[in-house]
C-alpha cells in the first residue's frame, strides 16, 4: 500500500490448462502446441481505488494496470508477456440511479499459449456471449451500465457493451 487509495505489488502466476476430448478436425486451433499448458509468470501491478463499496459501487473510480512476463527460463514452452488494464467509473445520476462504465484491455507480446490468449465473453465481460467465444492475441472492450434501485434489495439494470479481439 502506497497511500490511502493507491497500491503497488508483485504478480506471481501459475496457470494450468488441459484440453481433452478434442475433435481431430479442430486440432489446428492449438497451432501445434501441447494440449497441456503450464505457464509461469512474474510481474508487477498498480491499482488505484476510490470506490465507496467494492461489490456494489455507487461512486468512485477503479484503475488497474499489470505487466506479467512469462519467459522461457521459467519453464514456459511459449515465451510472452501480458499487459492488462482496467478502468471503471461509478456516478450517481438521480435517486437510486447509478451509471457505471468500464474499459478493459489485454495485450500479449510474443507468442502466448492457446490457454492464455485474450478473450471476450462471460458473465462479467460482454454478457450474452459465452466465455471464450472470441479469442485472439489482444482484446479491448467497453461497457456502460445503468442501475436503478427499485425496492429493498431489488433493482433493474440495462447495459450495453462493445469489444473486439485482434492480432
Task: Give residue spans per PLM region.
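Gram-negative/organellar outer-membrane beta-barrel architecture
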Residues: 1-38, 43, 120-124, 133-137
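C-terminal outer-membrane beta-barrel translocator/porin domains of Gram-negative envelope proteins
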Residues: 35, 42-152, 156-167
Amino acid at each position: 500500500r502506497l497511500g490511502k487509495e493507491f497500491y503497488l505489488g508483485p504478480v506471481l502466476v501459475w496457470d494450468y490448462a488441459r484440453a481433452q476430448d478434442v475433435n481431430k478436425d479442430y486440432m489446428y486451433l492449438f497451432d501445434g502446441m501441447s494440449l497441456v499448458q503450464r505457464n509461469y509468470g512474474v510481474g508487477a501491478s498498480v491499482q488505484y481505488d476510490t470506490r465507496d463499496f467494492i461489490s456494489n459501487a455507487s461512486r468512485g473510480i477503479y484503475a488497474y494496470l499489470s505487466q506479467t512476463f512469462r519467459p522461457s527460463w521459467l519453464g514456459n514452452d511459449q515465451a510472452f508477456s501480458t499487459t492488462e488494464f482496467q478502468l471503471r467509473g461509478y456516478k450517481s445520476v438521480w435517486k437510486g440511479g447509478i451509471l457505471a462504465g468500464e474499459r478493459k484491455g489485454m495485450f500479449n507480446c510474443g507468442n502466448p499459449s492457446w490457454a492464455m490468449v485474450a478473450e471476450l465473453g462471460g458473465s462479467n465481460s460482454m454478457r450474452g456471449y459465452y466465455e471464450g467465444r472470441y479469442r485472439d492475441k489482444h482484446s479491448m472492450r467497453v461497457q456502460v451500465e445503468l442501475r436503478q434501485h427499485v425496492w429493498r434489495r431489488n433493482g433493474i439494470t440495462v447495459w450495453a457493451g462493445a469489444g473486439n479481439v485482434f492480432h
